């Protein structure tokens, strides 16, 4: 795992959109079966968008639960919280239920939106082998055989679509504290 993290750091790939960029508009399926449109959400105020690898990732689950604990504060500040992974809607629903999440959990199958945010990388063969040997079938979770993941990332998108905060660490174990994100709203 440390090797792939170092390779991502060294390569500079999937560095993510930065502050001042316009966020790509998107419409994705929610775990509850509805469709969520970013433009519609932005009509109500800023949107915090979290990209995570999948419900199989323990770091992602910790992050999602941390945001759930801060959800009332986020909503008091007039913001909406959205979490996006490449997992199929069924797996997104499992993640939502397992973590008791009361915010949008969206499926970006094929990483279409994550790619627009410049977050997607191809998993190296040695990492695929490790995951397979441990019984983790990322391709089954994602509904394809691409073996691609988004780097975990957090963005604040203002009502005009401008990104006002961007955190895209190369190390998937490093996540920005939700309280820091709330301070930036």
Please describe what each predicted stretch is:
Residues 172-185:
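A short, polar/charged loop-to-alpha-helix boundary motif
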Residues 25, 47, 153:
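Conserved beta-strand and immediately adjacent loop positions that scaffold enzyme active sites
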